[in-house]
Amino acid sequence: MELFTEADHLAEARYRKLLREQPGFVWRRFSDGEELMAYVFFPPGHRAEAAAPSVLFFHGGMWVGKSLGDFVPWALHLAQQGIAGIIPMFRTRGDYEVEPMDILEEGREAWAWVHGNAALLGLDPARITVAG
């Protein structure tokens, strides 16, 4: 029995396309050259001096999945409300030899990256929320 329908797969492909159309920033670079990106859904007309609130989304499931597209609808909706939606990549057990604590640490590092780059991104560092 297939858990996901063809429509589910089509939606995921569409969300991944929308994700790739957003501004992407390298938030983590490894010694082997691999990079992890963070995609930001900015509010329409966003300017760096705006200091917008933001939500940092963590995708995945059971530390295995790599479902970057899961939060695209939420990020799009929030951007229309004046809130930036940020979807960072991070390593999961499905693709890397990492443990759940490694993944949690990367989540903390992603939050620290957003907080440390808030002025550059036009975000308010006091209004960064985490969801996932």
How does the language model describe each region?
Residues 49-62:
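Short beta-strand element of the alpha/beta-hydrolase
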Residues 66-74, 88-125:
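Catalytic nucleophile-loop/oxyanion-hole region of alpha/beta-hydrolase
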